[in-house]
Amino acid sequence: MNKKVVKPRLAIISCVLLAAVALVSAQSKTSNATAGSQLETRCGWFSNPTPSNVSLHDRDGEWIIGVQGGHQAKGDWPTFGPKQWVETNVHYGYGCACLRLRVNRESHEVIEIQSSRARPLSVCGKDRRLKRWKFEWEK
């Protein structure tokens, strides 16, 4: 075989192999992160102050469910009755809820909501494990 033909072929094969290794490595990291993320139940203040900006504030801090123009978790939000929801901006506001979900513990982002249920406001109001914090519009 001609040496001029062999060198380019080796270079192409090397590049293809390196790209394949990088792709497999990236997929492995993604699947490990998802596989390690177990379903868990978290209860706290469900805040939706403006369109698509949603988070759950529980005893461990803030869990980002959605950011306008960015991250949005899969799954349905809780349905709140009139006595379970405090309107602060037209129909936007906050309530108390429990969510069965999958989270990314490093970024505090909610990946998926499997199920959710609204709770009476008094449940979160009386829960001493929830930090006393003020909503952005109350500061």
Feature map (PLM): residue ranges:
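N-terminal secretory signal peptides that target proteins for export/translocation
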Residues: 1-8
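Generic detector of ordered secondary-structure context
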Residues: 9-11, 36
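Bacterial N-terminal signal peptides
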Residues: 11-22
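N-terminal soluble segments of membrane proteins
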Residues: 24-27, 138-139
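N-terminal secretory signal peptides
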Residues: 27-89
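Beta-strand-rich cores of mature extracytoplasmic or soluble domains
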Residues: 77-139
